[in-house]
Amino acid sequence: MTEFHLQSQMPSIRLIFRRLSLGRIKPSQSPRCSTSFMVVPSFSIAEHWRRMKGANLSQGMEFELLGLTTDPQLQRLLFVVFLGMYTATLLGNLVMFLLIHVSATLHTPMYSLLKSLSFLDFCYSSTVVPQTLVNFLAKRKVISYFGCMTQMFFYAGFATSECYLIAAMAYDRYAAICNPLLYSTIMSPEVCASLIVGSYSAGFLNSLIHTGCIFSLKFCGAHVVTHFFCDGPPILSLSCVDTSLCEILLFIFAGFNLLSCTLTILISYFLILNTILKMSSAQGRFKAFSTCASHLTAICLFFGTTLFMYLRPRSSYSLTQDRTVAVIYTVVIPVLNPLMYSLRNKDVKKALIKVWGRKTME
């Protein structure tokens, strides 16, 4: 009987609570009514619930990029400089990629790796520089939550892939100088393709872990990134939860990637140096060393800046230093790589002259 009575009263109860939630019921003005209450509108409850859920609401979230400078005149100057360097990066790496692709004389393992390096420089520079150019001229230097996550994923993927590819190029030089008679067997097309695919796989696996770890955190307050693109350390500093576990995980993976690549390079060049010193001819030693000069320069630039940037404690980060180093490995190195590998390489220059002569004759 009681159950039936409650069911019959449910419509009235729902109506009362609906009016309560909308703030439409007010206390009686009658003096006999001594009860008073305060109605909290449903909008306030919803707003409070959104705040309680945490700050990681991806819909509509934006990150404000602090950029390189706040001086408008300097921003316009940097826009011109960055645009010129980015154009040189695109043209230089595109020419190198196409030249190796169309020249039959360059279809060797060494140039296949160099072709992949040009592609990586083209790609990872393109994940950062276009957004930076837009922000130089924009009043609000913002990037969406998903845009920031996408930029970090592809940047980390291409940069880590390049780290492994440079190590593969060191192994290729070891095979060519220390085992010239077995070079075609050691660096067969299958092995070369495996090294390239392995570099990309390792790079994007690391990127998936890197990006997933950082963007699983909650971000609170002002989403101001103290950088000109979405990089790991500045984004981590915005989190409102404990990031120590994430930092340890990222440090382990970054350390493993850099340590494995660095050891491969050091062992390869130790064996190369040992072989060169045993050569009786001074001309032979010079020729062998000259084939490694461009690669050694690329190693010093890329690994020097990367080790400085990512294998430091968080407490030692300096905003000015980090921005300067980031400009070197995102803007300067991709410009220099095709120049270093082409200006000092006779095979590349011959192929370029041959292709250029063929085009002019047509």
From Swiss-Prot:
GO molecular function, one term: olfactory receptor activity
Keyword Magnesium on entry: no
Residues exposed to the Cytoplasmic side: 101-116, 172-194, 269-290, 344-362
Record-annotated membrane-spanning stretches: 80-100, 117-139, 151-171, 195-215, 248-268, 291-311, 323-343
Broad class of where this protein is predominantly found: membrane
Keywords: Cell membrane, Disulfide bond, G-protein coupled receptor, Glycoprotein, Membrane, Olfaction, Receptor, Sensory transduction, Transducer, Transmembrane, Transmembrane helix
Membrane topology annotation: Multi-pass membrane protein
GO cellular component terms attached to this protein's record: plasma membrane
Domain of life the protein comes from: Eukaryota
Extracellular-side positions: 1-79, 140-150, 216-247, 312-322
InterPro entries for the chain: GPCR_Rhodpsn, GPCR_Rhodpsn_7TM, Olfact_rcpt
Glycosylated residue positions: 56
Intracellular or extracellular location(s): Cell membrane
Cystine pairings recorded for this chain: 148-230
Family: Belongs to the G-protein coupled receptor 1 family.
Function text: Odorant receptor.
The name this protein goes by in its record: Olfactory receptor 5AU1
Organism: Homo sapiens (Human)
